[in-house]
């Protein structure tokens, strides 16, 4: 306040001197006054003096007030100058001019176009000066014209969260797109949030048991980790995703969120229908029993929507983690399309591209998303991210930047799928940072490495077998091949979500039982059992029972 008084006295004396000089130079001018036609220097000094003599603001303007983490979304922002007008439209980029600086929205604030046929939300990205902001449209700008009124909502894009979102499909703005009515909830969160503070993070490394044998044994998922899922069309990626959703819900009581980033509309619809058929999503009165929420930003939508839909899905998952203490599974398909959408937005905003045409902010854009996916003292978000590798070039900046964030990779192989072994996870190509004796313990680690060694030896012998046949192998090699083929088939497993297709009941295999079963295989305890008895079963007890059944049927 003292500095304000000093500034006021200095400005008064300065403005008085300036005005006196003007009067002396031109006797016809009247005495100085804050009239509209006063000299520019005198007028500006007068405005600054007026600011200096005014009382300091008691609180920040509503537009700059931080958005609350929770509370129903409203659009009743009534600050001075809250209405702007569209002054330029270039595709998905819209410039909006406001009357004065008081109504100027902060970066990341959402604006709504008024009197538009459909709801059109804009997100502030740049301040250009002259009270003009550059925004990214979250929907198509067809029919938008200059001069159209735009409302400053005073808050970032805010979406519904909580259990009411389970079994529902939302878009980037949190609007339901499944034609099943409004999402009724009292909980809303902004999509732009800071990553959890360092003091809130859980420091321990812990396995997230999935009940899937090949995953838990050879490439275990970290609780709160990030997993890259590599798989082409028709190798069982969708079924594996649905089984993970089902098993996490049963074993950990957690929920799942599926974020379709640049998703094909047909694939998104197919996934939704399959989830209904398999019981992951329930309709009608049983909707509250659903285990998954879906957030789609379809391939035909503008880049702004595709660049933000991943954040919308993550926000829904964060609520389950922070408010309900859940272990949440977050699926992002495809993380490359998230990067691609941000690249399109960056080009439209006029940024100079970086290597291979990607945005210069590639690492920070991806890091802002990935750093929010973590384990806290309240709960965890474990992310499974489908990754597209352009032209199979792993050195491309987009996948290379993504790999730096991953804790595990699950590779689905077409060769294994062609053998009829599902899940078609490649046990040699799939990796995990958790595969360490310090984290898993000696027993689990040694069993996993033993299984991989047998499978690798079998792979090395396949060329010899193809040329010379099994008879030319040594006795040790024959034993290796026999055990490897049994291990390969034992890695198959019937899924709960596939019961309606296969007729076989799904199996959830406990981690301890899983380790003991494969250790018994490596020790040769089950060398006398046929390969067929290891196919599509749960634990080793089922293998023994199936072998006895086969023996009885063959003897009959």
UniProtKB/Swiss-Prot annotation:
GO terms for molecular function: ATP binding; ATP hydrolysis activity; copper ion binding; poly(U) RNA binding; proton-transporting ATP synthase activity, rotational mechanism. Residues 1-20 have a biased composition (Low complexity). Keywords: ATP synthesis, ATP-binding, CF(1), Hydrogen ion transport, Ion transport, Membrane, Mitochondrion, Mitochondrion inner membrane, Nucleotide-binding, Phosphoprotein, Transit peptide, Translocase, Transport. The keyword Transit peptide applies. Residues 1-51 form a transit peptide. CDD domains: ATP-synt_F1_beta_C, ATP-synt_F1_beta_N, F1-ATPase_beta_CD. One of its GO terms (cellular component) is nucleolus. ATP binds at residues 231-238. Residues 1-37 are annotated as: Disordered. Gene3D superfamilies: 2.40.10.170, ATP synthase, F1 beta subunit, Bovine Mitochondrial F1-atpase, Atp Synthase Beta Chain, Chain D, domain 3, P-loop containing nucleotide triphosphate hydrolases. Belongs to the ATPase alpha/beta chains family. This is ATP synthase subunit beta-2, mitochondrial.
